[in-house]
Swiss-Prot record:
This is Riboflavin kinase. Belongs to the archaeal riboflavin kinase family. GO terms for molecular function: DNA-binding transcription factor activity; magnesium ion binding; nucleotide binding; riboflavin kinase activity. Catalyzes the CTP-dependent phosphorylation of riboflavin (vitamin B2) to form flavin mononucleotide (FMN). Residues 1-98 are annotated as: H-T-H motif-like.
Amino acid sequence: MAESTTAVGHDELAALKFVALEGAHSEPIKISCSELSDRLDASSQTASRRLQRLEAAGYLDRDVVTDGQWVSLTKAGETALHKEYTQYQEIFGDNSSVVELTGTVTSGMGEGRHYISLSGYMKQFRERLGYEPFPGTLNIDLDDDSTRTRVAVSSLTGIQIDGWEDDERTFGPATCYPAEIILAEQTAEAAHIIVPERTHHDETQLEVIAPERLRDSLELTDGQRITVQLKPKE
């Protein structure tokens, strides 16, 4: 049974940061426990245990070979480092960092219209977002750089939309993140990225909700490039 993330403390995060600085956030790197122990001022056994804990927590992928091991950060590992980064920004009063995602407008499967309009969600949108969203989502296919940057979104403070159930089925929770949608000189400020816990979309796709139909207010068509900006909570 894998260890829970509670097994990951500051020492393990220091090891995670080191392998990320060595390039493990973008591709697998080869490292020995003796090399890691020198950098962390710990014994080889301690360094090995820290990597094992990171792997058990889902922060690292490891492949042990005869002369070392190949390691790479998982999405959860990247998210953990982004959270550390965001906390340091809060400590030092730097809330200027903006997460910027770019992609192209695309047509969805129409599921957003159905789910957004359900009363169990709509009531929470009105209370927690401060508006009643247009029944549908704006779908964006992220470019390669933004797909990698997207992990930073989960380190921001989101607005929780709770799951609920009716007589027939249960509906999953979601998290909303305040965002600005930018197209040339036009901007839609009252918008949110919505990240459902249950979704058919992968990490390359983004869903946005807003009070108005963004395709109309920004005169959007499929294939247009668009930018989404998110800021840390002030």
